[in-house]
Every structure is written in C-alpha cells, then in structure tokens.
Amino acid sequence: MTQTNGFDALHAHAQRLRGAAIPALLAAEPERPTQYAWQVGPLYFNFARQKYDRAALDALFAIARERDLAGAFQRLFRGEQVNVTEQRAALHTALRGDLTDAPVASEAYATAAEVRQRMGALIQQLEATDVTDIVSVGIGGSDLGPRLVADALRPVSGARLRVHFVSNVDGAAMQRTLATLDPARTAGILISKTFGTQETLLNGSILHAWLGGSERLYAVSANPERAAKAFDIAPGRVLPMWDWVGGRYSLWSAVGFPIALAIGFERFEQLLEGAAQFDAHALNTPLEENVAVLHGLTAVWNRNLLGSATHAVMTYDQRLALLPAYLQQLVMESLGKRVKLDGSTVDSDTVSVWWGGAGTDVQHSFFQALHQGTSVVPADFIGTVHNDDPYAENHVALMANVLAQTEALANGQDSSDPHRSYPGGRPSTVILLDALTPQALGALISMYEHSVYVQSVMWGINAFDQFGVELGKQLASQLLPALKGESADVADPVTRELLSKLRG
C-alpha cells in the first residue's frame, strides 16, 4: 500500500490528524454526527468519532480506487480465483444469494440451495424423533460461527432441541457436556472440512462410543466419503461443504446445521437473507457510500497511519457475547499475513490484534487501560435499539453506557490531579442493530466479512488461506508418539526438556 501513488498524501493527512482532538474535528465539521452516519437495512453505523476528516477520507478512497477495490468485489462475487495460493474461488456470498450473472456463482448458489433443502428434511426427521439434545463437534470455523449464531438467536424458552457445542480436544470439555445428557435422547453432528482434524476426530470417537454407534450421528464435510467411512455414518446423514468456502466463512452452508436445529430452519434462512441484503450493499454501492468499505478503510487508517496495534469489540447485548471470539478468527486468520499475493514481503503492517468482550462487564475489567493507558485502542461498540426482554430499564442503562463510554473515550476530561485526568482521543465506531433478529445478525456478520476483504485488498494479501496454522499441527502430530512413551527423534532441546517433565 505504501507504494501507491496516493500514499504520500495520505501520510501527510495522518501527520496532520494524529494529535487532533476529536471534539475539534466535530467542531470543524458541524454536520459530522450525521454525515458520518449510515443506515443500511437493520444496521446503523456512526463513524463520527474516528480520527479522520473529509480530506483524509478522500485520500483513503483514492488509494482504494488505485487498488481497484470495486473490481476486487466483482471478482469475489463472480467466483474468480481470489484465493490465489490455493487456486480457489471464495464463494461464501453464493451460499446466501445470487447477485451476479456469473455462471460459476449461479451454479454455486443453486448447489447450496439444494443442500439446504436436504438439511431442512433432516431437521424435520430429527424433530419427529424423541431426541432432545444435539452435540455439535467441530473446531475453528466449524464451531465459532455456529456457536455464535445459535447462542445469539436461540429461544429463551420452549426450544424443541437444545444444541451443545464441543470444540477443544481437552477431554474435560466433552466430559462436562455429556455428563448432563441422556445418550438415548441425544444426536451428534461432526463438522470438519477435511475430516482429518485431530480435535474433531478424537471428540467424534468419544461421542460415537457414548452414543453406542452411528445411528444418531450426522456429519458435514467437504470430504463426505471420508466422513461416512470414519464413523460408519449413513451417506444420507452426511451433508457436503465445498473447497470454495473457507471454514471461517462457512456458517451459511451446511456447517450451519446446528444453527438451524437451535433456532429453526425458517430463522436460519432469514439469517442468510440478511447477509444477502448486505452483500448487495457491499457489491453495488459506490465506495464513498459503502459501509463495508468505510469500515475496512477505517481499520487500515488506524493500523497503518495512526499506528494502533490492537482493536477492541464491545457488544452491549449479552446475546452477542461470543461475537468478539468469532471476529478474532475471521479477522486474524484472514489478515494475519506477512507476504503479498505475489509472494513478496508486505510493505506495511497488516492485521491488528482483535479482542473484546460484553458490556458492561468489560467496563470493570479492561476499560481502565482504554481510558488511561498508554496505547490508543480503536473500538467498535455494538448495541441494539430495541430489545425484546421484559426488563426495559436494564436496556436503557445498557445503552446509556454505550453513549457514555464512547463520549468519554473520545473527549476525555482534564483534571488538576493527573491521576484523574482522561486524555481522550480514543476513536470508536458505534454500530446499532434495530433489534437482534436473524436478518440483522446476518447483515452484521456479512459487513465484517466484507470489511476484512477490503483490508486484504488494500494490503495486497490473501484473506482466504491460513497456512500459518499448519506448522504447529504438524509438530503436534510428530510429538504424539513421544508423549505416549514411544521412541521419537526430538531435535529441539527445550521440547525435549518439556517432554521429560510431562512423561514424569
């Protein structure tokens, strides 16, 4: 990005604005509170407290045009091989809508719709049995997305099926889950793209034995033959996924099977509808009015021009408490790259460390550092305008905290006592859902997906591979024999010492 024609001008704006007070920016642009705000379907965004002005934004958009961001969106949606290192398309958008005339994308959409029909039929069959509980086994993209959506949208009471998620290879996770269930009234779903994932295979074996066989086991995989063979699951209970959908983008596919079981098939389809509606905004809206583009460019601005190394996400709705963990994978696995598409080293920093939690709990843990620490941490504050629980006063208090915290972070407060002085200048974006509906959550997740893609295009990196996770898995596989007491050649001296401690 630093090699673009417009970077010097952008850098000059950053130098001008780095020390600017956010109240001064608001005073210089009196219409900023509304001009930097957008309503897209059920989502409202306000960027007025970010540390840029119109001139800096124009410079950002100029680089986005130089990077052919609009063309990059076309290539993504049309099913071109944007995942160049694996020579694959990234057609997660086709799982929820058909927005182009590209045959590849249209075929993917039709295939996904057919699999959803099969999934709906399996759900009807399950609901007609005496099964009351589902154990969903997966990890990473096979777990974080489904777990987030199921937790956010599950009924408060009266659910026909209860879904439990197990991801960690630590046996305690499976033990605690199964201890509360009756094997005669439980079914299991094993989700793995390759069906070679160690955690899923080990936990799947435990679940298979506990259930007494495969009669109530289902699977989702891009390798359905291996899935069926590994646990003797009938082919009719194995749903496919595809190599043109990355795990962290897959909740819209049959990986969403546990979502549909937890919230109902109709509401699962509404989730997809909401995502498709935001997809249309991302694909068809001019850059300057495109919220996904602005969100992504804001992240680039804060990372590369203002030097922020981390980004916080605070969800002021308890039902979205798992969103920060989901976004950690979506953002950091997608953007944690140090080489560009052509294999050369990047010329700027890439991904920030994403983290966060649920408000107001986090105000009593890490907000001290946000307000008075030495690091400036940009943040997203996410809340809901309307809440459907019966405790209206609580929701008012919750939203009062969103307003108060974002104002305090931005404006600060002087004091004669330095210990009680707040420097301010902490930028934030406020995102409000009209209500936490399937459509709104689908749109919100879609927005973050496209924001990630924007950042990858600006940095010239591949958002759709994850080779960084492989080395550790390979070494773990090689060390298993040594931990079991078998002879093994372990070259690393620290690993040898740790092995001796673990083996007693």
From Swiss-Prot:
Active site: 333, 364, 473
Pathway(s) the chain acts in: Carbohydrate biosynthesis; gluconeogenesis; Carbohydrate degradation; glycolysis; D-glyceraldehyde 3-phosphate and glycerone phosphate from D-glucose: step 2/4
Coarse class of the protein's main subcellular location: cytoplasm
Pfam hit, one: PGI
Domain of life: Bacteria
Subcellular location per the Swiss-Prot or TrEMBL entry: Cytoplasm
Cellular component GO terms, alphabetical: cytosol
Keywords: Cytoplasm, Gluconeogenesis, Glycolysis, Isomerase
GO term, biological process aspect, one: glycolytic process
EC identifiers of the protein: 5.3.1.9
Main enzyme class: isomerase
Stored InterPro entries: G6P_Isomerase, G6P_Isomerase_C, Phosphoglucose_isomerase_CS, SIS_dom_sf, SIS_PGI_1, SIS_PGI_2
Reaction catalysed by this enzyme: alpha-D-glucose 6-phosphate = beta-D-fructose 6-phosphate
Its biological purpose: Catalyzes the reversible isomerization of glucose-6-phosphate to fructose-6-phosphate.
Family according to the record: Belongs to the GPI family.
Protein name, per record: Glucose-6-phosphate isomerase
Taxonomic lineage from the root: Bacteria, Pseudomonadati, Pseudomonadota, Gammaproteobacteria, Lysobacterales
